[in-house]
Design a protein with these regions (language model features):
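N-terminal secretory signal peptides
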Residues: 1-13, 31, 36-39
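Non-catalytic accessory regions flanking glycosidase/transglycosidase catalytic cores in CAZymes
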Residues: 18-29, 40-268, 272-281, 306-307, ...
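Active-site His/acidic residue clusters
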Residues: 285-301
């Protein structure tokens, strides 16, 4: 199989970001590098019989409970994510408050559990008081993170309204770049105090008598990176972050705080040594970067890199929590993750059409494998956010007349709407592939879930083999599948298949026949496909 060109940075930095050279990024494009380098094996011919894999699923071997907060999303004042995306006052498709109804409907289909805002890089220069009060009186600013004019017509009150419409918990990231302790404390006061103080009464004056009860708060975004406004080293952030955490929790002790992490122990350890008793999560970001369709296997293998970031974050957090005998350990918040073609769009000044990627079937396979990984790491990953919801590296794109659901929308919908809440261990033996950066990767990537009553099993199976089908032989241990069930597939004519406004259904979810029963059964997984099997057990 062709390994393709090297789509991922090899230099070990968070992201190749040198503003003078015109390269920007949203998050960590690469992280700890895989040291073993090998060449990809030759491809098998398309006419050869299906390869075989064996998969053993035992309902007694549980990995842990899946936190519904892993199905979160993210909206940032970047490109057309907010204006022209979620919020479009001039659109005939908007409701009376300016929210695009078609975007809200699609977000409901994704079962977004919590929604992160206002950034992202944008948060490091955002002053929340600019975005409250009468809209026509709000000051317009020039955003130095993404080089766009910001009208501030979408602010805290509008964000809370949007969250409520899609039944998502709000997750606010405060400004630790140009922001102050007073500003962060006042924001919590505005959102969460019932009244009797200046900012809670200001919220009432603005037409919102009841407190918002915002539970999740992030203490800054990617402040470790030189691309960030107010960039700091770990020691400085650890000291400053502690003070932010103190005043925010003094305003409302019930809130959950997310420390700014990087997935790198050299940053995460000193940060958590300072903030351990104050925070509930530490963040990690991962983006796989590829602008070459030939990088098929290199891209799909890169999910292993995301898993390495998760393990690194969890190792530090769990170790320090155990040493301090913290009753509830600090969890990992993978609050930005996705696949992107390049970062060049970020440096385009005054261009609102940034990062509007037409995702392919290959990208949908990557998203499904990433979700499998997040589910398998459910013991430590308790919050996750796909970046972002609409138009910007997003599963949907708007036009003046409608909404397009891209290929990545469909695995997101399947996992959030049909997964069980308990992750199961899967012992899998699958044929493997290797690339320049990622060795010994299984063609068949699997996650299994059940419910607390162990009445139903779901199997999410990604066949990453481009050249042919894979025949999976399943064993359920002492359990039996009842006849019936449901099966869904996401596939297309080739890995480059994409949805467009002219051809919106090239890649969608299709229901197919599932004829399984007993403790052993077989299922043939089409090449480059996502298959979803669910059945009751006894």
């Amino acid at each position: 199989m062709a390994a393709g060109s090297e789509c991922l940075s090899r230099n070990g930095t968070r992201r190749d970001f040198i503003r003078a050279l015109g390269t920007l990024g949203l998050g960590v494009a690469t992280q700890h590098l895989v040291s073993r380098r090998v060449c990809a094996r030759p491809p098998t011919g398309p006419g050869e019989p299906a390869l075989q894999a064996t998969l053993k699923v035992d309902l007694e071997r549980q990995l842990g409970t899946i936190d519904p907060n892993i199905y979160g999303n993210f909206i940032e004042h970047l490109g057309r994510c907010i204006y022209g995306g979620v919020y479009d006052e001039e659109s005939t498709l908007a409701d009376s408050e300016g929210d695009r109804k078609d975007v809200l409907d699609a977000a409901r289909r994704l079962h977004v559990t919590q929604l992160r805002w206002p950034g992202g890089n944008f948060s490091s220069g955002y002053h929340w008081k600019d975005g409250i009060g009468p809209k026509d009186a709000r000051p317009a600013r020039y955003d130095l993170a993404w080089f766009q004019r910001e009208t501030n017509r979408f602010g805290t009150d509008e964000f809370i309204s949007t969250c409520r419409k899609i039944a998502a918990a709000p997750y606010i990231c405060v400004n630790v770049g140009t922001g102050t302790l007073d500003e962060a404390s006042a924001w919590v006061e505005y959102c969460n105090r019932p009244g009797g103080t200046f900012y809670s009464d200001l919220r009432k004056k603005n037409g919102h008598p009841e407190p918002y009860g915002v539970k999740y708060w992030g203490i800054g975004n990617e402040i470790y990176g030189p691309w960030q406004i107010g960039h700091k080293n770990a020691a400085d952030y650890a000291q400053m972050g502690l003070e932010f955490a103190k005043v925010m929790k003094w305003q409302d002790p019930s809130i959950k705080l997310v420390a700014c992490g990087s997935g790198d122990p050299s940053w995460d350890r000193p940060v958590l040594e300072s903030l351990l008793e104050q925070v509930d999560y530490i963040s990690a970001h991962h983006y796989t970067v590829s602008d070459d369709p030939k990088d098929y296997y290199e891209v799909l293998g890169s999910v292993a890199q995301m898993e390495q970031i998760i393990r690194s974050s969890a190792l530090v957090a769990e170790g320090l929590s155990a040493r301090a005998r913290k009753p509830t350990p600090v969890w990992t918040a993978l609050d930005e993750w996705n696949i992107i073609n390049n970062w060049a769009d970020g440096s385009k000044r005054d261009d609102v059409h940034k990062f509007e990627i037409m995702y392919t079937l290959r990208d949908a396979l990557w998203v499904a494998s990433a979700l499998n990984s997040i589910q398998r790491h459910c013991r430590t990953v308790r919050l996750a956010n796909l970046a972002q919801l609409v138009n910007v590296i997003a599963p949907m794109q708007t036009s003046p007349t409608g909404l397009l659901l891209l290929t990545t929308f469909y695995p997101l919908e399947l996992y959030a709407s049909r997964s069980g809440n308990v992750a199961l261990e899967v012992a899998a033996q699958s044929p493997r592939f290797e690339t320049k950066s990622f060795a010994d990767q299984p063609f068949l990537d699997v996650a299994a879930t059940t419910d607390e009553q162990r009445q139903k099993v779901t199997l999410a199976v990604v066949n990453r083999r481009k050249e042919g089908d894979l025949l999976g032989s399943f064993e359920l241990g002492g359990w039996k599948a009842r006849p019936g069930g449901h099966a869904f597939q996401i596939t297309g004519d080739n890995p480059d298949a994409t949805n467009t406004f002219a051809n919106p259904h090239a890649v969608t979810t299709q229901e197919v026949t599932l004829g399984v029963s007993g403790s052993r059964f077989q299922y043939q997984f089409p090449r480059h496909s996502i298959s979803w099997l669910e059945f009751e057990v006894e």
